[in-house]
């Protein structure tokens, strides 16, 4: 019996294997959330703002990994004291395609402070984030969502738009992973949800939040400094 066809088949198989291997090595195995976003943009019927307060922390790397694995981008409202102490994590936030924003320096009740003290909290955070490589923030979230005319005025003087939230995940209050997923399911186009960098239950919820948004053709967007609403990344 002739062995010609068998030899030809083996040679073809080896050549195909080489081609497949070459292609695999030429194509990145992972994408950042920012790189993956254009492929999904056509399916987006709206955008929501995922936000995480109080970082960067020891939980930040795991959170960034979860977000990028699930093709999500988010706004990270960093405390200035932690940005100053962890500049590499601020740079990691930016590298992962996240937006970095101001959440005061020490997380005080700003409405109980003088105008000069409020200014110091905001200004020092702007400097800490910029110095860490996070750019100059355009968004500001007052701690506890507490604000008044003075807080808004000082933030505006620094070129910041104040952002509160439409949906509170209650992760700061011990909400379960299921409860956090249900909270995210209430988001509608343009709305913003409050979550926290340090919450283990929130970290566990990220894949299911991504699935829920995709099922409703909603995408994670940036928060517009002009309107304070979530919009397509620009």
Could you tell me what each predicted segment is?
Residues 1-38:
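Secretory targeting and sorting signals
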Residues 38-113, 117-118, 124, 128, ...:
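Active-site beta->alpha N-cap acidic-glycine motif
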Residues 40-44, 66, 70, 83-85, ...:
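C-terminal domain-boundary segment and adjacent tail
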Residues 48-52, 74-78, 99-104, 138-142, ...:
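Structural recognition of the beta-strand scaffold that forms the well-ordered cores
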Residues 54-61, 84, 112-119, 145-146, ...:
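Soluble non-cytosolic domains of exported or imported proteins
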Residues 55, 79-81, 105, 143-145, ...:
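Active-site beta-loop-alpha junctions enriched in small/polar residues
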Residues 62-65, 88, 92, 120, ...:
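Alpha-helical scaffolding segments of alpha/beta enzyme cores, especially the outer helices
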Residues 146-187, 218-229:
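His/Asp/Glu-enriched short active-site or ligand-binding loop at hydrolase and phosphoryl-transfer sites
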